[in-house]
Regions:
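Active-site neighborhoods and metal-handling regions in enzymes and metal-associated proteins
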Residues: 1-486
Length: 486
């Protein structure tokens, strides 16, 4: 088996557009941990069932700092090693190296016998030189990783090097770092593992906060993801007649969108919510086992993940037959007005919380006007009230990027209590959810759930709706559906 193979290509790819952006990101995180070794794993393959793995997706911090997307690269680890000031990459404090398992020779057992990494099984793998050229990042064989991580580990007070680890990504790397810490501790039997967890958590926090403001390359990737997602919504409308005829019509809707995600992107950014009728009042309904019925609405919350791993996150609530009823339109318009109020305050200098508060003011006023609130809108909006949350229990916005709920480890003072800044990308997604079993409201409201969600880029001139090409108003939605169904 080892002979009579054509030569392996040694051609190296051009330097990727993302390479310079990823280098700047590494420099930024280097500034925060100048004398410490930083270890950021991509993560291992995850088992779905027995010997079948899920498709691989690297950890988002790893992807952000390397520029790698799609399914690159199981078990890889990015190590930023501290060096003398000014001697690091681009004059920084660290030298970065990407450790991964390169292609195996065709004379090796791995090539034809390893179903997880052998090229006979999974296709061509990159060489060290190819990734180095593509990423502008030094590479090394993963067999050298243990020495790279554990060398000189110890307490800085006695000349050792401290490590910070992106924890709970790869348990093998967790164990390697923990063992190195234990073996070099002054008093290993009384190690403060809680303090070490806090040390590592600061790295996760910093990596998360680094993504609060997107660079130009990231913004372009968000636009790619949004465009594919809009195309997926068009596919959904075209699939509605088949969905109505099927006993699990929600799955038909889900499947139509999934096909677009795989054709135009890498994958789904998250499990699609395709919620017909009363299922739309279940916030994370993704079983998608229900029917899609004429006269009802279907709430679809979906996003395509681009090959760069950046995802969109868009929600529309569509009338299945192409036209909203009077009650459906009434609820939809209230949610749309709340979204527009949130848009109006999504400007640089305002607090992130202001976006949610603006939407809640509109919804509380509308619920009071309809006679649904047991108190005034003012009382409901007070900290002691919150009665409106019976029908709108979630936040209006979250950051968006490599994760659908991006920057989740960022400190509250920079996220929820932070100031809106140019370059941020986040959602605006108010909703109203009136459950079938809610006896506090008149019957005509029940069984209707509406959410409208768009992806917003903050610029110096205010918010730009990246998903504006997907109709939002009731009239525009109806006209759009008629055009696609004609």
């Amino acid at each position: 088996m080892a002979s009579s193979w054509a030569p392996v290509s040694t051609e190296t790819p051009a330097r990727a557009d993302v390479a310079d952006h990823a280098a700047r990101r590494r420099r930024a995180i280097s500034e925060q941990f100048k004398t410490e070794r930083l270890v950021l794993p991509a993560g291992p393959l995850k088992v779905r069932s027995n010997d079948c793995d899920y498709r691989f997706r690297p950890h988002s911090a790893f992807a952000h700092l390397t520029g790698l997307g799609v399914d690159h690269e199981p078990d890889a680890v990015l190590v930023l090693d501290p060096v003398a000031e000014g001697k690091g990459d681009d004059g920084g404090h660290h030298r970065a190296t990407l450790y991964f398992r390169p292609m195996a020779g065709r004379d090796t057992k791995e090539f034809y016998a390893d179903s997880r990494s052998g090229e006979f099984w999974i296709g061509t793998r990159p060489s060290l030189a190819q990734f180095q050229a593509q990423l502008g990042l030094p590479t090394a064989d993963i067999s050298d990783l243990e020495v790279a991580i554990t060398k000189n580990v110890g307490e800085p007070a006695v000349g050792g090097t401290s490590i910070r680890l992106m924890r709970k990504v790869d348990e093998n790397i967790d164990a390697l770092v923990d063992t190195a810490r234990y073996n070099t501790a002054k008093d290993p039997d009384n190690m403060d593992f809680g303090a070490l967890d806090e040390l590592d958590a600061k790295l996760a926090e910093a990596a998360s906060e680094l993504r609060l403001v997107k660079d130009a390359w990231e913004i372009e990737q968000m636009k790619v993801a949004v465009a594919a997602t809009i195309a997926g919504f068009e596919d959904i409308v075209k699939a509605l007649p088949r969905a109505v005829a099927h006993k699990r019509g929600e799955r038909v809707v889900e499947g139509a969108f999934f096909a677009r995600a795989r054709e135009d992107g890498n994958e789904l950014g998250y499990d699609t919510i395709a919620a017909g009728g009363n299922n739309a009042t279940v916030l994370h309904w993704n079983r998608n086992t229900g029917t899609v019925n004429e006269g009802q609405m279907i709430l679809v919350d979906a996003g395509v993940e681009a090959e760069s791993l950046y995802t969109a996150d868009i929600t529309r609530t569509l009338p299945v037959n192409g036209n909203y009823s009077e009650m459906q339109r009434k609820i939809y318009q209230a949610v749309l007005d709340a979204a527009d109020a949130a848009f109006a305050v999504a400007v640089p200098g305002r607090k992130f919380r202001d976006v949610h508060n603006a939407a809640m003011e509109v919804l509380a006023d509308r619920l009071a006007a309809w006679g649904l609130l047991p108190v005034t809108a003012e009382v409901a909006l007070s900290a002691e009230g919150q009665q409106h949350r019976r029908w709108m229990p979630h936040g209006t916005s979250h950051h968006l990027g490599l994760d659908v709920h991006d920057c989740a480890q960022a400190r509250a003072e920079l996220y929820l209590d932070g100031v809106i800044t140019e370059g941020m990308v986040f959602t605006i997604e108010p909703g109203l959810y009136f459950k079938d079993e809610d006896l506090a409201i008149p019957a005509e409201y029940r069984g209707n759930g509406v959410r409208i969600e768009d992806d917003i880029l903050i610029t110096a001139n205010g918010p730009v709706n990246l998903s504006a090409a997907l109709p939002r108003t009731p009239d525009d939605v109806e006209a759009w559906m008629a055009r696609l169904s004609g």
